[in-house]
Amino acid sequence: MLIKQEVVTYKYGRGWIDMMREFEIERQFDIKIEKLKPNKGVYYLKSNKGDRCLKRINYGTQKLLFVYGAKEHLAKNGFENVDRYFLNIEGEPYALVNEDLYTLSNWIKGRECDFTNIEEVKLAAKKLAELHEASKGYDPPENSKLKSDLGRWPYLMEKRGKALEKMRGMARKKNLKKDFDIIYIKNVDFYKELAIRATKILNNSKYLSLCEEAEAEKVFCHHDYTYHNIIIGDDNEVYIIDFDYCKREIRTYDIANFMKKVLKRVDWNIEYAEAIIDAYNTVSPLREEEYEVLYAYLLFPQRYWRLANRYYYNEVMWGQNIFINKINNIINEKESYMKFIEEFKSKYNQVG
């Protein structure tokens, strides 16, 4: 999040469209732009009212109002370390410029969380628990679109498990197979078996009753809790940003997703998993039935499925080498990953 390059001044070197956009942002947010610079998918904006983060939103106002309401709910419940939106002159959390939506929030000075640093990982785990606690009781604003994945994961796991086999068929039908196809075909059985195991464990767990509890408690999850959305501020406080994917969800999804993001960077070291769970539990202890759902999430081969899905359905325009490197990275983790799964299973008394 630190600004390393020279910041371009507002008044020079701009196209007409950029100048009109900035004029509208100034007008709608009642600010004066002094400097503006692209930075990792957003804009660093220096204004007469302080440093800001300007972001173009790629979804509609109904979803944006859900995200805005979620952040305001957290702040109201004492969880203030989020990138809250400034309101425009009409009291709305966005500017509308040529059918594009822009949000404006404070620029948080700090660094991205280092997932190889176990102390920073513990801080992030504790902050996630605080977020989940503060999320309780969220009623979305009027005219917002309620987003929810509650109850969907048994269906999603089964569907994605079957998709692994379907994509093998797609690879086999190719007359000219590329290296990715060959690697995928060779390894898919292992990941297909993991998907079957994970789906069975989830179906035999208390997943649905946990979803009912989450629905009754009106909780939500961040749904993209990863290093670049966890900022260690210059004040050593932990800030959470980018709630674009937040939705109604059981907390074990966020925990499992966070754990996977960390563990793949530390060779699936069980100590990091224990550190995350222990730190989370100091704020809001997990119950026995939640460990079973957590285990199912950790077991499901989400990364392998997602990569293959992107490849066979052309979801991203990466080159062949990028796809090959990514699938090889996943496969090369297989031994350490399975060792971790057995250790987790033993440590937290899981079966299946």
Describe each region flagged by the PLM.
Residues 23-46:
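ATP-binding glycine-rich phosphate-binding loop
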Residues 102-115, 166-173, 300-318:
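A glycine-centered beta->alpha junction motif in the catalytic cores
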Residues 2-3, 7-30:
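Juxta-kinase regulatory segment immediately upstream of eukaryotic protein kinase catalytic domains
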Residues 42-46, 85, 200-251:
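Active-site acidic catalytic loop and adjacent metal/ATP-binding pocket
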Residues 252-285, 298-321:
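Active-site activation/catalytic loop segments of kinase-like enzymes and analogous catalytic loops
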Residues 55, 113, 142-220, 325:
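ATP-dependent phospho-/nucleotidyl transfer catalytic cores
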Residues 165, 304-352:
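ATP/Mg2+ or Mg2+-diphosphate-binding catalytic cores
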Residues 50-146:
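ATP-binding pocket architecture of kinase catalytic cores
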